[in-house]
């Protein structure tokens, strides 16, 4: 039984789905997709549960969410195993994902009070009060790269605010989605407050088409995000929060410590096998001897990265991609770049056919032409050379995306210029592009999305503000507006 609707585990009525390990190819999970009718049932359950959940004292909702955090800690080893096996990422990285999920609970509670709690301002004749109210029924679409952590960044603040949720994990990570929801069940969520529907495109389309939804929170590709935006066009009554991808630039301007710069570039481009939306896709390196030395060392160290299974010992820096198809997509993109005139510096290769284990690739795009502005979601780093910093910033901004941007340089003035001119929601200096704080906004501009998904700023789109002017006693003002006469017995006499 792969669906959780109104507090019951039920069997999907749609197509059968089998999830295999992308490296070892053993079957991990099997179940059935939700039918459109079951998606509708999940929405009805969420709608029915909403009034009582929203009326609960915040402390009661907080207690359940904090119980969920306790269960995450108690089940960390097992959930790590599930996520690592299903995604292909190494054990060490899956463990950090669970830790991030736990840490976001406390931050989300604080964010609720700080950003969307109640604020009272005393006035001479009463008070002005700002309150926040939940939207109602929200759909949450989860991605596959962080199947626990990223949906958690929507679900936790949504529940704290008093919303009810229909959660659709990625069709590539149904096992992780189910494992997380089972912990929510143990935490004591009332029936219908959180509902799980499994499936691919058809399930997603049925969910986003529900007329009774009050909003949709999405993390995933720009293509799907654009489709959802079109589907919900003309429905301003629904909140739509999109966190999408990026074609992110990392500028390298005469680094003083070559190895430190190389380490930062590798962390930016290849962690999670390049499957983070903030990963560096474009490396802009200044022409000259320092830039040449940096590139040579980057190629040398990257060539030593050997992807391996999730439980390999010693642990690898990167594991497999989410699927063999995803690995083949990266190889296809590399070949397309070569056909357009790019020069291969380090060829990406499948470690073993039939698996998703792919070595990182580096390619010089300086002489390539007609390169599409698309996110290649995997370990492929494209290099451009530049002569002056103004040109580097222009190249960095030459994308429809605007998620992350970064600079490796000892020069603070260069970073100050980038801060003013960069078109990105995240701009880092001598820090990996993939580094982010849960207390900071996470998101970008342009094709990278609209709202800022994270434990802190997610509170903003999980509740709407209600302004009130209020006083316990109603009295006639001492000073009246012109034309108003409340003098006793001074009205018009009847004929």
UniProtKB/Swiss-Prot annotation:
Residues involved in NAD(+) binding: 220-225
The entry's keywords: Arginine metabolism, NAD, Oxidoreductase
Biochemical pathway: Amino-acid degradation; L-arginine degradation via AST pathway; L-glutamate and succinate from L-arginine: step 4/5
BP terms from Gene Ontology: arginine catabolic process to glutamate; arginine catabolic process to succinate
Reactions the enzyme catalyzes: N-succinyl-L-glutamate 5-semialdehyde + NAD(+) + H2O = N-succinyl-L-glutamate + NADH + 2 H(+)
Acyltransferase in keyword set: no
Catalytic activity, EC: 1.2.1.71
Entry's Gene Ontology molecular function annotations: succinylglutamate-semialdehyde dehydrogenase activity
Enzyme active site: 243, 277
Function: Catalyzes the NAD-dependent reduction of succinylglutamate semialdehyde into succinylglutamate.
PANTHER family: ALDEHYDE DEHYDROGENASE-RELATED (PTHR11699)
Family designation: Belongs to the aldehyde dehydrogenase family. AstD subfamily.
NCBIfam families linked: arg_catab_astD, PRK09457.1
Protein name in the entry: N-succinylglutamate 5-semialdehyde dehydrogenase
Organism: Enterobacter sp. (strain 638)
């Amino acid at each position: 039984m792969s669906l959780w609707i109104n507090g019951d585990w039920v069997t999907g009525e749609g197509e059968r789905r089998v999830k295999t390990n992308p490296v070892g190819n053993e079957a991990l999970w099997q179940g059935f997709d939700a039918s459109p009718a079951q998606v509708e049932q999940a929405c009805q359950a969420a709608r029915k549960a909403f009034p009582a959940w929203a009326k609960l004292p915040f402390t009661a909702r907080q207690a359940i969410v904090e119980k969920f955090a306790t269960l995450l800690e108690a089940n960390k080893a097992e959930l790590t195993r599930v996520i690592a096996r299903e995604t292909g990422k190494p054990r060490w990285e899956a463990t950090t994902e669970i830790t991030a999920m736990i840490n976001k609970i406390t931050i989300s509670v604080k964010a609720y009070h700080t950003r969307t709690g109640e604020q009272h301002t005393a006035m001479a004749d009463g008070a002005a009060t700002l309150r926040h109210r939940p939207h109602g029924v929200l759909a949450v679409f989860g991605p596959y790269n962080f199947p626990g952590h990223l949906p958690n960044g929507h679900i936790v603040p949504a529940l704290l605010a008093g919303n009810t949720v229909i959660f659709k994990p990625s069709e590539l990570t149904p096992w992780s989605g189910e494992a997380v929801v089972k912990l929510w069940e143990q935490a004591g969520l009332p029936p219908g407050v959180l509902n799980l529907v499994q499936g691919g495109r058809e399930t997603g389309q049925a969910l986003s088409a529900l007329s009774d939804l009050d909003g949709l929170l999405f993390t995933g590709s720009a293509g799907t995000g654009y489709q959802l935006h079109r589907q919900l066009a003309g429905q301003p009554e629904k909140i739509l929060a999109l966190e999408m991808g990026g074609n992110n630039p990392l500028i390298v301007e005469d680094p003083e410590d070559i190895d430190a710069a190389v380490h930062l570039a590798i962390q930016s481009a290849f962690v999670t096998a390049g499957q983070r939306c903030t990963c560096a896709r474009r490396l802009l390196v200044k022409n000259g001897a320092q830039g040449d030395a940096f590139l040579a060392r980057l190629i040398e160290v990257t060539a030593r990265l050997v992807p391996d299974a999730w439980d390999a010992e010693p642990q690898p820096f990167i594991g497999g991609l989410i699927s063999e198809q995803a690995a083949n997509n990266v190889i296809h993109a590399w070949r397309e770049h070569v056909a357009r005139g790019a020069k291969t510096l380090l060829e990406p290769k499948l470690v073993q056919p039939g698996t998703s284990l792919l070595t990182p690739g580096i390619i010089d795009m300086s002489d390539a032409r007609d390169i599409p502005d698309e996110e290649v979601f995997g370990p492929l780093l494209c290099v451009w050379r530049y002569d002056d910093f103004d040109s580097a910033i222009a190249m960095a901004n030459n994308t429809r995306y605007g998620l992350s941007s970064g600079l490796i340089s000892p020069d603070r003035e260069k970073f100050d210029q980038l801060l003013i001119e960069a078109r990105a929601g995240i701009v880092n200096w001598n820090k990996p592009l993939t580094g982010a704080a849960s207390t900071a906004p996470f998101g970008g501009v342009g094709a990278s999305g609209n709202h800022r998904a994270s434990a802190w700023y997610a509170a903003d789109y999980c509740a709407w503000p209600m302004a009130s002017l209020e006083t316990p006693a109603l009295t006639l003002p001492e000073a009246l507006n012109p034309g108003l006469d409340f003098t006793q017995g001074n009205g018009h006499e009847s004929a």
